[in-house]
From Swiss-Prot:
Record's protein name: E3 ubiquitin-protein ligase XIAP
Entry note about domains: The BIR and RING-type domains are dispensable for anti-apoptotic function.
Natural source organism: Xenopus tropicalis
Post-translational modification: Degraded in a 2-step mechanism; a caspase-independent first step and a caspase-dependent second step. Stabilized indirectly by MAPK, which acts to delay caspase activation, rather than directly phosphorylating xiap.
Gene: xiap
Catalytic activity: S-ubiquitinyl-[E2 ubiquitin-conjugating enzyme]-L-cysteine + [acceptor protein]-L-lysine = [E2 ubiquitin-conjugating enzyme]-L-cysteine + N(6)-ubiquitinyl-[acceptor protein]-L-lysine
Amino acid sequence: MEPQLAEFVLKEEMTCQCPKMSDGAYDMDVDQNYFEEEVRLASFANFPSSYPVSAPALARAGFYYTGDGDRVKCFSCLAMVEGWQHGDTAIGKHRKISPNCKFINGFNNLRSDCILTQVPVMQNGFQNSAEDLAERSSSEIMADYLLRTGRVVDMSTPKYPRHMEMCSEEARLQTFQNWPAYSPLTPKELANAGLFYTGINDQVKCFCCGGKLMNWEPSDKAWTEHKKHFPECYFVLGRDVGNVATEANTHGGRRRGSELACPAMNDYNARLETFSSWSFPIDKETLAKAGFYSIGDGDATKCFHCGGVLNCWSATDDPWEEHAKAYPGCKFLIDEKGQHFINHAQLKRPILHKANSADASPALPKDSNLLKSPLVTDAQQMGFPLEEIKKVMGQKLKTTGKNYTCVEEFVSDLCAQKETVLEKPKEIEISLEEKLRQLEEEKICKVCMDRRISIVFIPCGHLVACAVCADVLDKCPICCTIVERRQKIFMS
C-alpha cells in the first residue's frame, strides 16, 4: 500500500460579505489589537450584564466591545453585531452574519488567539523553495515567525473535513459499488477508517484530510495504514470532525459531539416553555440559557445538545458550572463558555451533581447480579476493585437514574474516582493555575509527551499512552505486562 502525495496549495486572502455591517468601507486587515482572546475579554469591562449573551462567549467568538450599547465587532472580518436576543449564541450569530470570516470558519479546530495571514500552505510534508521565500514580504515573514513560535495559528488551511459529503460512513460505503475483487480489504473496513473509493484501481481517499492510499496488501489494516501515512489527520487523531458512524459502530449509541440530543429544544424559547410549571428554587431562565430544559420529572433537567441530565438543584447552584462539572465535553457548553471556564469548573469537583440527602442513592443490584454485567467484567480485568465499581455505579444512578451503557464512559469515571481517592488532604494549598498545569500534565501521553492519554492497556489497566503510541506498543511501559487488548476511553 502506498500513499498518494497531495499537491502544493496556496490559499488566497478571504473576502467577507456580511449583511449586517457598519456603514462605509472597512480595512480588510485584521484588528491586531484584539487578536488575543484575553484582550477582547478585557474590552467588555463596561458591557451591561443584563444583555442575554455573556462577555466570555462574545470574546471567544472573536468579538470585542465597541462601548456603544450591545454593539460588538469581530477583530478578524470586522463585522459589527448588535440587538442581541434571548436564545442567540455568539458563535451561531457570527457564522450567520459573516459566513466567510476566516476566524469563525476555523473555530472548531483552532485556537482563538489568532490573526489572519496570507502564507503558503504546505500539505503532506512539502517545503517552500528558496525562490518562494525570497519573494515574501516582511509582513509575511513576520506572520511565519509568529506561526512557528506558536503565538498565532494559520487560518488559511482549508476547513475540515475536506469532503463534507462523505462524513457519513454509509455514504462512503456506497462508493465501493465497483470495488475491485482482487483487493484484500473489505469496503466496510475502509469506510470505517474514514476512506471512500475514488474509482481508480484500488485507490481510496480520506473524507477528512484528503489523503489517498492505494496498492493494498493482504497484511494491511485500514486504520493502521491511515495512521501511519497521515498521522496528523484530525479524524485519525480522534477529533470531532462530523463523522457519522453506522449503527453497528456507535458503541452502544454513543453520540458524536456534532449531533443534537434533542433538536426540538435547540431554541431558547422552546426550552423556556418546558418550565411553565417550574416551582424549584433555581431560576428557569438561567437553566434555559445553559442549554437545559425540564423533562417533567421533579427538578430533573436535560441538555438539548449533549443529552446530559442534572437534578437536585439548589438556589446557589450555577447551571453553567454544574454543566461543566458533569458534562465537560458538551460542544454547546464549549462554544458558549470556553475551555478555560470548563477547566476551572473541573477543579471544583466532585463532578457528580449534589443529591438531596446522603441516603438518596438508589439501591444497586446484589454482587452476584452485578458481576454478570460485561461492563463490570471489563473494569475488573483492568484492575479496578469491586468496591470502587459499585461506588461509581451508585453515583451514576443517583445522578441520572440510569446505569452505564458504554465502557468508555464507565472507565473514565472510574479513573476520575481513583484520582480523587489518591489525593492527599494534607498537601499545601496550590494555586488554581498550578493545579490546572498539573492536571494537563497528568493527561499527557508518557511515551511521546505530546498527545493526550486515551488508551487503557488490558489486562494491567494502566492508562499512560495516546492512541498513536499505544498502537505500536506490545508491552505496557509501566509494568512490562504483555498487552492483550487496548480499550479507548474518553477523558473528561
